[in-house]
Structure formats: structure tokens, C-alpha cells
From Swiss-Prot:
GO terms for cellular component: chloroplast; mitochondrial small ribosomal subunit. This is Small ribosomal subunit protein uS19c. GO terms for biological process: ribosomal small subunit assembly; translation. Protein S19 forms a complex with S13 that binds strongly to the 16S ribosomal RNA. It comes from the Eukaryota. It comes from Porphyra purpurea (Red seaweed). GO terms for molecular function: rRNA binding; structural constituent of ribosome. Belongs to the universal ribosomal protein uS19 family. NCBIfam families: rpsS_bact. SUPFAM superfamilies: Ribosomal protein S19 (SSF54570).
Length: 92
């Protein structure tokens, strides 16, 4: 179920304050965050946000196409590992 419109998008308070502080100062810094559930808003465009995937922080450069999506959508948490080709032959 989607979020109610009258509540507005979810954005972590500490992330929002850091974005607003960078917008007023005009600096460009990488912002570390663990909040994968935060929605990308237009104020974040042009900033690089390092999103945690459970192991390390991955930098995500926010563009205008990303507005409305969640930060966690752009950083995968699982890596797909295929079986070694030699293992397939050994099983035959």
C-alpha cells in the first residue's frame, strides 16, 4: 500500500537537515546515510549521498529522474553469485 498523500513523503530528519545546510552554504560534500527508506526530494538534486547497503556506503549522485524514488532502490543489498562452470560438469 502506498503512503497517504496528506502525510507527505518520508525523509529522515537528520538527512533533511544536512541537505538543507548544504543548500544554504553551497558546498558539495558526500553525505553518509543509513536511511534507505528516505524519499528523494527536489532539494537533493545535484548532491552525492552515500547509502549503506549493509556492508559499506555506496555513493549515489541524485539526478532529476530520481525524484520520488527511495534511496535504497539505487543500491543493491545482495550480490548474485553464479555457480562455477567446473561444478556443473562435475555433476553430470
Amino acid at each position: 500500500m502506498s503512503r497517504s498523500i496528506h502525510k507527505g513523503p518520508f525523509i529522515d530528519v537528520s538527512l533533511l537537515t544536512r541537505i538543507e545546510a548544504l543548500n544554504t552554504s553551497g558546498k558539495k560534500e558526500v553525505i553518509k546515510t543509513w536511511s534507505r527508506a528516505s524519499t528523494i526530494i527536489p532539494d537533493m538534486i545535484g548532491h552525492t549521498i552515500a547509502v549503506y547497503n549493509g556492508k559499506q556506503h555506496f555513493p549515489v549522485f541524485v539526478s532529476d529522474q530520481m525524484v520520488g524514488h527511495k534511496l535504497g532502490e539505487f543500491v543493491p543489498t545482495r550480490t548474485f553469485r553464479t555457480h562455477v562452470k567446473g561444478d556443473r560438469k562435475a555433476r553430470r
